[in-house]
Amino acid sequence: MPPATGGGLAESELRPRRGRCGPQAARAAGRDVAAEAVARSPKRPAWGSRRFEAVGWWALLALVTLLSFATRFHRLDEPPHICWDETHFGKMGSYYINRTFFFDVHPPLGKMLIGLAGYLSGYDGTFLFQKPGDKYEHHSYMGMRGFCAFLGSWLVPFAYLTVLDLSKSLSAALLTAALLTFDTGCLTLSQYILLDPILMFFIMAAMLSMVKYNSCADRPFSAPWWFWLSLTGVSLAGALGVKFVGLFIILQVGLNTIADLWYLFGDLSLSLVTVGKHLTARVLCLIVLPLALYTATFAVHFMVLSKSGPGDGFFSSAFQARLSGNNLHNASIPEHLAYGSVITVKNLRMAIGYLHSHRHLYPEGIGARQQQVTTYLHKDYNNLWIIKKHNTNSDPLDPSFPVEFVRHGDIIRLEHKETSRNLHSHYHEAPMTRKHYQVTGYGINGTGDSNDFWRIEVVNRKFGNRIKVLRSRIRFIHLVTGCVLGSSGKVLPKWGWEQLEVTCTPYLKETLNSIWNVEDHINPKLPNISLDVLQPSFPEILLESHMVMIRGNSGLKPKDNEFTSKPWHWPINYQGLRFSGVNDTDFRVYLLGNPVVWWLNLLSIALYLLSGSIIAVAMQRGARLPAEVAGLSQVLLRGGGQVLLGWTLHYFPFFLMGRVLYFHHYFPAMLFSSMLTGILWDTLLRLCAWGLASWPLARGIHVAGILSLLLGTAYSFYLFHPLAYGMVGPLAQDPQSPMAGLRWLDSWDF
Amino acid sequence: MWGFLKRPVVVTADINLSLVALTGMGLLSRLWRLTYPRAVVFDEVYYGQYISFYMKQIFFLDDSGPPFGHMVLALGGGFDGNFLWNRIGAEYSSNVPVWSLRLLPALAGALSVPMAYQIVLELHFSHCAAMGAALLMLIENALITQSRLMLLESVLIFFNLLAVLSYLKFFNCQKHSPFSLSWWFWLTLTGVACSCAVGIKYMGVFTYVLVLGVAAVHAWHLLGDQTLSNVGADVQCCMRPACMGQMQMSQGVCVFCHLLARAVALLVIPVVLYLLFFYVHLILVFRSGPHDQIMSSAFQASLEGGLARITQGQPLEVAFGSQVTLRNVFGKPVPCWLHSHQDTYPMIYENGRGSSHQQQVTCYPFKDVNNWWIVKDPRRHQLVVSSPPRPVRHGDMVQLVHGMTTRSLNTHDVAAPLSPHSQEVSCYIDYNISMPAQNLWRLEIVNRGSDTDVWKTILSEVRFVHVNTSAVLKLSGAHLPDWGYRQLEIVGEKLSRGYHGSTVWNVEEHRYGASQEQRERERELHSPAQVDVSRNLSFMARFSELQWRMLALRSDDSEHKYSSSPLEWVTLDTNIAYWLHPRTSAQIHLLGNIVIWVSGSLALAIYALLSLWYLLRRRRNVHDLPQDAWLRWVLAGALCAGGWAVNYLPFFLMEKTLFLYHYLPALTFQILLLPVVLQHISDHLCRSQLQRSIFSALVVAWYSSACHVSNTLRPLTYGDKSLSPHELKALRWKDSWDILIRKH
């Protein structure tokens, strides 16, 4: 009786253990089952000609690389205007060159590299990158495009080497390389100033070095082993540093490492000390090293971007103090809040702004007809409030009174400086959020009623502490109703000047909407301190920028009634993305996968699942497979399984994401899918050839199959290449157009 | 066969008295004073309205779960449905049978107690451990509160436990008597219980997935069992009913039969049952009601009353000259009809952009005479249906003429008021400036069978593609400002990528226009339509639409005073006040037995750590446990710890408003795990008899403390005793607990 759960599966033999390092692999001894399969393959030359074989090996690799570079760099300069997201990433490259601070939802490495490429190629950062379609004119943009195309070109050789290592079959690797070289989608995506070629470069580099280091497993702690292991770590850091999609490849490497360690741990010939060494090496190379590099990119990012720019408002007041040009930079204000201080109060949630009031009343029918209180994103005199004691109305700035600091838990009154009305709340429903209470300005010259009293509290601090400017996170709790001052983030109608709604929420949940900090602080009786003391430390900056990025990412929500790309559209190549041009006179580039390649990939996934499960069931039933078939099934299950895992990890998480999705998000998954296709067809054709061995032409089946696949993809590329290299003339709906017969799906509009 | 003639008939009853006692105590704790309080408690206000809908057989749509749950609650009904469920705390009128409505959830809660006992026993743990699990279920305050009201969690938990229990029974049968009668019974029951659980609440899917997963692993091991034949010659054997239940034949049964039986019971039966729930639901609620508007016109027309009354007798095929109302298929943000009125777009918008100053076209969410449009043949002038009528087909060119103003639907290269990237849609007024009418539209039937299909009322979903600019008529979803009376904006979308509901329209009301004269036509438009065609949607079409709308319906995330986050559940940092007596301070809270919650989480942590330790040791070939104990430990963990994980962790990914009661299914699995861990510690980790005795004493002490806590919290569970403010304050053990104290 086999064990009920656990244990049994892990000990199965589906382990990618054996193999040799690097190019020698193909020359490995015949003991290896996988290599044995290759040994009998028709492509395999005789033993005597090792030298010739090595030359051939390198020549093929060179050919693949050359072809990849040639296709990617062909007509790279066209169109000479901004295409699609170049407007963002080119602009961000310029920001690095100009050293102005900006905000983006992706980590900085990709844009930093683009900026560096531009800088080295002589681009001066003066082009505005305003909107797609703007001409570059005399500005040098080829450096940035060339850099992206350079990285994008490496995808093909990387995939080639990965498949070669996984399947030990040149034909599988060639097929994969052809699929990727001739895919119009990969080609288009590599030709422009985008993050995707950089991201995919790191993903594939990580995959390749992981596979390489797996095949070095029989020589642990040797130089190549260390090299590939640390290279994996570096690539992981790179992938994560470009986009958070890099997390998926990290997950894949992580799963692979866990399985690997589990295997080593079960190897009783290894002492626990050796296993410990293995563990330490992986922790060092796959956790510590990437983390250090990733942090370093952020350090560089913050060092380079030292000037105030368009991204300031997304960050907290303390953060802004470190940007030169920002009005908080080098400012000096009193550190602790005291009665009589004039302050501005900023909401901690991104893009909400400052507590604001103005001489306009809430309109008839919306709560009480009292003065409006809103939040406002821009600096304005109406953002100023005076903090006063709740029970006295004397002027605390009178020099005869001693300075009295505001402390956590004090009951205060906030008086609007311009209109002398008090911040007030009562049991009327708020204008937009019906479950909350309305907040108004009330009273004349500071005299109101008990609904003007608020308790000021510092989040997570002890009672009695003083309140620090910028650093303290404070809440205002309404004394009578017990509700908390917050902003719902909803835009008020025209009567509220489209500022944001301020409410008093009865739900005492700690959300950022109800937490504020004091930004400006004027009090002549207090000594000013330089804000530099308050500057956040590097870990704080790192944490904050991540919070802002994550919030920005989840804030990219699709609107109702808008066409959005759905993950299920992607593998079937349902619709593309317009990179440039709309009308028939425009130079049009359309991001769309080569349908022959993509539909072949889709078919291959289905075929793989089918054949894989047949083989797995057969093995579980204890079927005795001939040596050759066993070898091929090992390739299919181990090599194919790893690649399939990659595809799964890079595709299915998108179904769970709430943010806006685009077609180009599928491309990392598509790389894995193409590798799977290469492995699958090669193996299936070999199995076919083996099954029909009695037939005289059996060996030819494999060669003919691979050749026809190669030629088929090449021909389809010839048909579809105008999608990537650009087309002018009538649209494909028009029967006159040369592309007319190629609009195979109604949803493609090129 | 005639054996009973030869031997005397003997009935031997095997009664497990502890099981009977447990059931009795369970019933007592759940049914005691069931009708108290005779007032609406918390979510009863929500489920109650659906019970009323069932009683009145009115169609409704609820996104919280499939209809089986509501049906189970309504089963206890038997009243006329006349009660206004609008306020928590409202006194029930005398026509509401409170006892019978609350009976089914209470019974489900009571039966969970003996089932916990059975499950632990079937996991091959001792009678003592099994008793422990059942007694813990018995005194868990949160479970008691939740089962004594018209709420669904206790029923869900009942079916979850039933699914696990019957799977275990089936699995234990598998070893000695596969394909016996009881084997089939338990296997089928597993499938049935799973689909019932899913039918109660979508949450039931989690347990279903768990059972499927465990079954798949077991089936995989079965595949590896080389003593079973392949598809082979024994196929006929297992197909013959005679061999069922015969042990000697079991060796010959093929693997294929095993897999097939599992697939049928665990995949086919649940799907069929799930469809059956909807079938019964749609048969029961056949009258139109307040939720009609959300559904498509075709669906509404299949209900009795409502739209069916209006559309009954409309001509089916739209012809040139037909008068129609056009409803947007997407129905978001509100269902609405294509509309126009005398007013024009303002010359200059507030942001300074200009408009064409032509007649507004909007989407209007109410029935109105201005929603009528006439389908006109561009080549002819008349606005009446010729005889015989010439039906409009896919690909035909049409003009849409607004019935009350006789202006035709037009779009041109002017930015729309709120969506400047799209084209403005207007009804054309000839100002005699160089802006010609562009009012030709090509009709595309989206759900056509062939390219020559006729445009049908209600059934056809159509798009209007503008001939000059190839823009598509679309509902943008934005509300126009005051000049547009806050109606919805209609635009011409130029970049139409594929199918989207907001560009698709269907004819709802329809009649053949007969009067050429404008005055007469206006009168005609004001009068209701008639003539008769029956159109019935098939069950599958209605099911798929209903299911789709239920899943797509998203109530805007309303914050709630008692909503909580999953992290707060494990340590019971939150509670929900369910009910407060109108005069005294007697109150009911959803508040768990904190001793059980904390020790459950502890047991889980211990289980995880111990398992990791054992796994690592086994990997190094050190076997601490004998093989059978190890298998028992793994299976118990897979079901109990796994059950907790699948019922808890997915909530972290959910964006909807969450409440403490969502944690209860996970909690029951934790309670099942507790005695398992305790017995394991006593059996395998206590080395001497002395240690074992000390451990037992500790367990007894711990259990008494749990009992004590349960008893202390009892007034908040049953709400039967009014406590003084002082006593209430003493019960507020955590600052985050919200216990209601009256201010006098």
Swiss-Prot record, chain A:
It holds the Pfam family MIR. Residues 334-390, 403-459, 464-521 form the MIR domain. Glycans are attached at N98, N330, N445, N528, N583. Keywords: Congenital muscular dystrophy, Dystroglycanopathy, Endoplasmic reticulum, Glycoprotein, Glycosyltransferase, Limb-girdle muscular dystrophy, Lissencephaly, Membrane, Metal-binding, Phosphoprotein, Repeat, Transferase, Transmembrane, Transmembrane helix. It catalyses: a di-trans,poly-cis-dolichyl beta-D-mannosyl phosphate + L-seryl-[protein] = 3-O-(alpha-D-mannosyl)-L-seryl-[protein] + a di-trans,poly-cis-dolichyl phosphate + H(+); a di-trans,poly-cis-dolichyl beta-D-mannosyl phosphate + L-threonyl-[protein] = 3-O-(alpha-D-mannosyl)-L-threonyl-[protein] + a di-trans,poly-cis-dolichyl phosphate + H(+). Slightly activated by Mg(2+) and inhibited by both Ca(+) and Mn(2+). EDTA ha no effect on activity in vitro. The modification Phosphoserine is found at S41. It comes from the Eukaryota. One of its GO terms (cellular component) is cytosol. It is a multi-pass membrane protein. Residues 1-23 are annotated as: Disordered. One of its GO terms (molecular function) is metal ion binding. N-glycosylated. Highly expressed in testis; detected at low levels in most tissues. Disulfide bonds: none annotated. Pathway: Protein modification; protein glycosylation. Changing Y666C: In MDDGB2 and MDDGA2. PROSITE patterns: MIR. Its main location: endoplasmic reticulum. GO terms for biological process: basement membrane organization; dentate gyrus development; protein O-linked mannosylation; reactive gliosis. CDD domains: beta-trefoil_MIR_POMT2. It is linked to Muscular dystrophy-dystroglycanopathy congenital with brain and eye anomalies A2: An autosomal recessive disorder characterized by congenital muscular dystrophy associated with cobblestone lissencephaly and other brain anomalies, eye malformations, profound intellectual disability, and death usually in the first years of life. Included diseases are the more severe Walker-Warburg syndrome and the slightly less severe muscle-eye-brain disease. Muscular dystrophy-dystroglycanopathy congenital with impaired intellectual development B2: An autosomal recessive disorder characterized by congenital muscular dystrophy associated with intellectual disability and mild structural brain abnormalities. Belongs to the glycosyltransferase 39 family. This is Protein O-mannosyl-transferase 2.
